[in-house]
Amino acid sequence: ALNLSAKDLVVGMELGYPPFEMSDKTGKASGISVDFLEAFAKKNGYKLVVKNIAWDGLIPALKTAKIDLIMSSMTITDERKKVVDFSIPYAKANLAILTPLNSDITNIKDLDKKGKVLALKRGSTGHLYAVKNLKNATINLFDKENAAILEVIQGKADGFFYDQLTIYRTWQKHQDTTRAILAPFQENPEFWGIAVQKGNAELKKELDEFIAESKKDGLFDSLGEKYLKDVKDTFKKNNLEFFF
C-alpha cells in the first residue's frame, strides 16, 4: 500500500565508491548503502531521496540541513564528531598497502626508511597515518587516488595506502605491475558510521536500532554476498576480517 504520509528522508552520499555508493547505468543511485537505506526507510515509514554530493560538501550540507544524514563510507573520527553525531558503527575498514610488484616491501615497517617514497591522497586516512607514524619516508601528495596509484604502477613510489577494498581491486587490475599487502597494520581499525545533525537524537536512535538489527538478522551478510562475494571469499581465505 502506498503510504501517502511517508516523510522524505534526504540522504547525502558521494556516488564514487563502488559497490557501497555508486550509480547504475541509468544514473540512479545504487549499492550497499542505498540498499541498506531503502530497507531502513521502508521499516521506519520514510521515502528515500538520495543526493549525490562531492565528498567535501557532505558535512556542510548536513550542517545546513540540506540533507538529513550522510551514509558514504565515512570513518568516525574525533574531528568529525565535533560537528556531526554518528550512529553506532555499521562496518569496519583497515588500510592496506599497494606496492610495486618487484619492490622489497613486505610490511609497513619496510616503508619507514630513508629513500622510501609514499604516494598518498591528500587528506585521506592513509595520509594522516603516514604523517603520524612514518617519519623517515618521503611523502608525495595527490588530489586524486588514481594519480597516486599511477606512481606505484610506474615504480616511482614504494607504497600507496588506502582501504583494503580499493587496494585489492586496484591490484586485480594491475597484477603485472603491483602487489597488495592486505594485512592490517593500524592499531585500530576504522569504523564507518552514519552521520546525522548534532542533537538529532531521534534519527540516531532509529538508525542505531536498525544497524543492530541488521547485524543480527543478516542484512549486512546478504549485502556482502550480493555486492562483494569475491572479496569476501578472498578475505576469508587470508584470515582477514570482512567489513561487516
List each language-model region with its residue ranges:
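Periplasmic-binding protein-like
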Residues: 15, 91-99, 164, 168-211, ...
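Short helix-initiation/N-cap motifs at beta->coil->alpha
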Residues: 34, 50-60, 105-106, 140-154, ...
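Flexible hinge/capping segments at coil-to-helix
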Residues: 100-117
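Ligand-binding clefts/hinges and TM-proximal coupling segments of bilobed small-molecule sensing domains
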Residues: 125-142, 179, 211-244
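Extracytoplasmic small-molecule ligand-binding "clamshell" domains
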Residues: 2-74, 82
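Extended ligand-binding regions for polar small-molecule ligands
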Residues: 34-43, 103, 109, 122-124, ...
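Beta->alpha turn/N-cap motifs
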Residues: 12-17, 51-56, 65-77, 101, ...
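A ligand-binding cleft/hinge motif common to bilobed small-molecule-binding domains
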Residues: 57-60, 72-82, 129-132, 153, ...
